[in-house]
Amino acid sequence: MTKLRVGLLFGGRSGEHEVSIKSARAIAKALSVDENASKYEILPFYIQKDGRWLAGEAPQKVLETGSPLLEAEQSTSEGNLTSNPQVQTLSKWESPSQVAQVDIWFPVLHGPNGEDGTIQGLLTLMQVPFVGSGVLGSAMGMDKIAMKMTFEQAGLAQVKYKAITRAQVWSNPCVFPKLCDEIEAALGYPAFVKPANLGSSVGIAKVRSRQELEAALDNAASYDRRLVVEAGVVAREVECAVLGNDQPQASVVGEISYDSDFYDYETKYTEDRADLLIPAPIPDAIARQIQDMALQAFAAVDAAGLARVDFFYVEATQEVLINEINTLPGFTATSMYPQLWAHSGVSFPELVDRLIQLALERYSPS
């Protein structure tokens, strides 16, 4: 049987570059075991932090070591940009020849330029199937403002929020105090200030005072031109995984327990800082409500293949509030998404196989 050549695309121009490598290593391992090994051939492609694509030995080395390439290694890697300085000024990257050999793409790129619709647009232009959401679903799942507006239209309950632009924060020192007044009046304290288009809690701050609010807005504006401020809520953080295309399934519900003030980047990716409770110790009726809302959110943003949907469970009032949808969640062996499916009866290798089959199904014109 002819093997399907899977283009495993990882790294990227993002603050989540290292997380992408971890996810890609886990997926490569899953593609190399048992039945998957007889069906799939892995063609790894590594996108450097400057945006250049590498194929051949370089990405294989990154997968083996789990570490980004050093600058000295990048300059001599196979598939790198031509050494002609005039060409370098014209194009930031050139496509390695191995791109033409790919039967299906498996992008494992987290954050901007990876799960925001940009790479999905490129893969769509290639007219080759790829795992995950398309341009629309990816873009909607990345931009927190567009996402929240969509959830609102879908009738999904969520925390109060206010959308802000960088111009409002930086343009006029006379306008900024009024903006802070409006935020305080609408949301109160504590509140969370977030860049609209970054993942893994990068640039997010919890604020409890005017001074902290001003500093957090200034910091978030350095990451993104679109910002969102959310009202704080005393709640448990629970998550549900979704798998499928037009008839998706929801996993069991899991809960995140952590020892920090909120689930920030350090807590997410530092060992033993957070515990995953699967299934979450919540009432069955609440779990079913979360699963239903996860499927509604998946459909609302036009997601495909996979997504992890995050919620707040306000135990005191029995309310469930949707927080966000992540259309390309972390995919290490210990990440919440594969763990939720493992507890739902789908092993990691089987999950990877099903995602590839879902991508082929979605691409098929029938």
UniProtKB/Swiss-Prot annotation:
The keyword Phosphoprotein belongs to this UniProt entry's keyword annotation: no
Catalyses which reaction(s): 2 D-alanine + ATP = D-alanyl-D-alanine + ADP + phosphate + H(+)
Enzyme Commission number(s) of this protein: 6.3.2.4
Role according to the record: Cell wall formation.
Keywords: ATP-binding, Cell shape, Cell wall biogenesis/degradation, Cytoplasm, Ligase, Magnesium, Manganese, Metal-binding, Nucleotide-binding, Peptidoglycan synthesis
Pathway(s) of this molecule: Cell wall biogenesis; peptidoglycan biosynthesis
Binding site for ATP: 184-239
Protein family membership: Belongs to the D-alanine--D-alanine ligase family.
Entry binding sites for Mg(2+) 1: 310, 324
Domain ATP-grasp: 148-357
Cofactor names: Mg(2+); Mn(2+)
Coiled-coil annotated residue ranges, if any: none
UniProt main location, coarse: cytoplasm
Protein name: D-alanine--D-alanine ligase
Organism expressing this protein natively: Nostoc punctiforme (strain ATCC 29133 / PCC 73102)
Residues involved in Mg(2+) 2 binding: 324, 326
GO biological process, one term: regulation of cell shape
GO MF term (any one): ATP binding
